[in-house]
Amino acid sequence: FSLEGGESLIPAIDFLINSAAEKGIEEFVMGMSHIGRLNTLVNIFGKSSRDIFGEFEGKDYEEDIFDGDVKYHLGWTSERISTSGKKINMNLAPNPSHLESVDPIVQGIARAKLENDFDNNTNKVLPIIVHGDAAIAGQGVVYEVIQMSRLKGYSTGAVSYTHLRAHETTSD
């Protein structure tokens, strides 16, 4: 599930994070499916290739307690420094194989951070959701979450939605 054909996602997210940090955002909560996820973990979240391959080899998790979903759907939390030197907290939410079920999770994590850590200051947390082609169908969880985000109890102030078109190559 490479990012082939959509490589511009990495510099786009990097630009978004650095620009938002300049405006005062301190926490980013991101949700995405499998396409480009490993690339994003390494290049945006700073997860080492060694950690990723360790998960694939099954050395980091006891099989009894692991939920059985694919390992590249696990979440990750990290801290990074923006291009201007600001500390940024980063969270990539775990994503189950039902691709867009992560959307309300991301919104909920962001809302909880706003309420518990930032006194509801919506200028401190930015949710980022990356969708694949199949998610933009005009109905379903994506649009439900967008509609809920307009309700007082669910609003996070803003959400960055990105549509990533899946490019698959085949040979004859």
Regions of interest found by a model, annotated:
Residues 1-4, 26-27, 85-99, 123-132, ...:
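Glycine- and acidic
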Residues 1-43, 50-51:
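N-terminal amphipathic, basic-rich helices that act as targeting or association modules
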Residues 2-13, 94-106, 138:
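Phosphate/oxyanion-binding active-site loops and adjacent basic polyanion-contact surfaces
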Residues 18-27, 47-55, 81-85, 112-123, ...:
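Secondary-structure transition/capping motifs at alpha-helix termini
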Residues 32-36, 131-136, 164-165:
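Acidic, glycine-rich active-site loops and adjacent beta-strand->loop/helix elements
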Residues 38-45, 136-143, 150:
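Short acidic, glycine/serine/threonine-rich loops at helix termini
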Residues 53-107, 111-115:
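Active-site cores of enzymes that catalyze phosphoryl transfer or operate on phosphate-rich substrates
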Residues 163-172:
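Single conserved hydrophobic/aromatic residue that forms the stacking wall/gate
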